[in-house]
Amino acid sequence: MKHVRIVGVPEHFNLPWHLAIEEGAFEERGIVLEWTDIPEGTGRMAQLLADHETDLAIILTEGIVKSISEGNPSMIVQEYVGSPLLWGIHVASQRHFKSVSELKNTKAAISRFGSGSHLMAFVNAQKEGWDTSRLQFEVIDNLEGAVAALAHGTADYFMWEHFTTKPLVDSGVFRRLGDCPTPWPCFVIAANKHFLARNENVLRHVLQCINLYTKEFKSIPSINRTLANRYEQKLEDIDTWLSLTEWSQKQLTEETFKSVQQTLLNLHLVATEKNFTDMVWG
């Protein structure tokens, strides 16, 4: 049996992986897939890839493009979620903010530098017409850290996936002022180059297997109830999320890659332009 290490966020997007593991789908192909949840998100997962502490990661597109641009020895091996991610823009419920425009020149909570919450703060600032050089950040590690930072006033707002934070909005911990969708497919599968060079056939089996699961995922009977129970979400929220989410079984296109890279260049988040073939496997 070939052991493969994989990391991802503990969110509903990744249920297909857990179902495939639980049902022995990878083991049927001679693969033991060792999944680790990373609640800190993309910045932490990029570091794990760079340090050879994981073989694969289910990671935000913009985050891994930035990380590879900065020398991370990894490659994008496939799209995973082809639809955009809906980033909610949240404040503590007791704060005075009423609109996103009021957040100009305030401090954003981010899980870490290079994370989705960090990069999307720039995308949102550009969308709002703010001076991105004046953005301020407070590193909070994870969602629990964001709750504490916003409550104590060490940060003013926090961007995180809309439906993951919905229970905190419903319970009155956060207020959502708006949403900012990513302008590209949100999640990709990335592989450490050391693993990739030695295990191309193993990787192909992993991709074939997960693609079967994601292709059929929405047609699984009562999958909405399974998701709602497993991730402690309201059924109507899961139904809305499922209607907005499309899993992908294809490689990231050069056009999409260039769009992500150009946005990062325009925001001065990467310094140099890289070739598609240097970053995307195929």
Predicted segments — roles?
Residues 94-99, 126, 132, 193, ...:
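Proline/Glycine/Serine-rich low-complexity intrinsically disordered segments
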Residues 273-282:
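Hinge/cleft segment of the Venus flytrap/periplasmic-binding protein
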Residues 197-271:
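Secondary-structure end/capping motifs
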Residues 112, 134-136, 141:
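Glycine/proline-rich, positively charged
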Residues 2-130, 156-162, 174-177, 181:
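Short, glycine-/small- and polar/acidic-enriched structural segments
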Residues 138, 144-227:
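Pocket-lining segment of extracytoplasmic ligand-binding domains
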